[in-house]
Amino acid sequence: EIMPSLVGSEMCIRDSMTTGNLPAGSQSLSSDMREQMTVLAYTDPIGKVSKETVSGHLMIGYDDLYSIQYFQDNRMPYWKHDGKVDIHQAFEKGEASYEDLMRRCGSFDSSLMSETSAVGGKKYAELCAIAYRQAIAAHKLVTDKEGTLLFLSKENFSNGSIGTVDITYPSAPLFLVYNTDLLKGMMNPIFYYSESGQWKKPFPAHDVGTYPVANGQTYGGDMPVEESGNMLVLATAIAIVDGNADYAAQHWEVLTTWANYLLKEGLDPKNQLCTDDFAGHFAHNTNLSIKAIMGVAGYGKLAEMLGKADIARQYTEVAREMAAKWVKMANDGDHYRLTFDKPGTWSQKYNLVWDRLLGLNIFPKEVAATEMAYYKTKQNKYGLPLDNREDYTKSDWILWSACLTGSMEDFNALMVPVWNYANETTSRVPLSDWHFTSDGTQRGFQARSVVGGYFMKMLEKKLGK
């Protein structure tokens, strides 16, 4: 059934809604109207309001024909099944399955709220609820010519990069909890880029293009330690969640290259870009060093799972040696520094969360405990700043830092101010992950997939930690 519809100015259509009837015919737009938002309106006449319950629904969809250009090949959206399904058939199937789809959605909503509440309380559940859809929606799902799944993110409200590794990394907890195939779909383009010989450097690319064209990195700078650590840690996390290292085995050669890069360059990183370079990039980054150590330790864990005992022993021992050096180099008394060479500085060491969650056990437990105690002295009303340089923070990283010790008291201490931000912010935008901790206003970024990182506490539960 085709419903009455009209394209026109928002003011005209809004006024017509008071009568319940859209104007007949097309609408010519005056100069004043052209300055307004143009909208599409539908009406579904379901009768007058009465005591009897009446329901109706609209189905709204968009056929982008081809979603992504992937290394010179235009790829259809996944739902088209390589052209076997068109938009009309998709609508017909959706209509036929409407009741079942609504039931399944309602069931998942209920389970998400109950499970997240059980793990982290009502406020944590509400944070996860507002993050879930946003984290998934910032991607396009396609396959390559061989049918390999590609789940490509768009770096919203920054530079529009597609398939950015340091966007995949913070979003990963949600997908590790619910569907590792989608996380593999984020990593597959980066593996392909290196393994095909198109990316020749001894560390992963930052991205594979600018959305929606994924023909190779377009970002102006590399993040060598950042992206190497990200890919190795995530490959390890996938193996532990899946219960096997099959995915890592498929990419062992390039993972080995990246692990060896971290052995050489990771302990005391040079002046290079990283994901948190908002206030400028810098050398001797202690949190970036932790990521490198976790990457090396993760490689050792993967080798162990693949029966490569000698390699496992070698890389695990080296990771422990690196961690011991880190503790001495970063020590600043009651906390650990932002950079090895600057006493009196501090930063969130959110990368350390993997040491406990993945069972790597490379760092002394006292490091996380010391950091957590110090964080509690540095919080503002709307959260823990990212480091000592600025008032602003990244809320995804706070939810990681909140899981450093495994203590519920520590988790709540850092999580609740983030809930206060989400609940009280005057910035009425799709959830921003970059905000000021003093007044709760948006600093930048919105509608980004990184809020999947809010699910770190759920991942902790899934891994039995």
Regions found by a protein language model. Name each.
Residues E1-G8:
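Single conserved hydrophobic/aromatic residue that forms the stacking wall/gate
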Residues G61-D63, S110-A118, Y169-D181, N230-D246, ...:
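Well-ordered alpha-helical scaffold segments within catalytic/enzyme domains
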Residues S28-K48, A138-T164:
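Asp/Glu-centered strand-loop micro-motifs enriched in Gly/Pro and often flanked by an aromatic residue
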Residues V54, K80-M102, G160-P269, N285-A303:
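Aromatic-rich carbohydrate-recognition surfaces in CAZymes
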Residues E10-E99:
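Beta-strand-rich recognition/accessory modules
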Residues A125-I130, I136-D144, G163, S196-A205, ...:
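Aromatic-lined, polymer-binding surfaces characteristic
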Residues H88-N159, D181-Y192, G197-K200:
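Low-complexity, Ser/Thr/Pro/Gly-enriched N-terminal "stalk/linker" regions
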Residues W252-D276, G280, G307-K349, L358-K465:
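Non-catalytic carbohydrate-binding regions of carbohydrate-active enzymes
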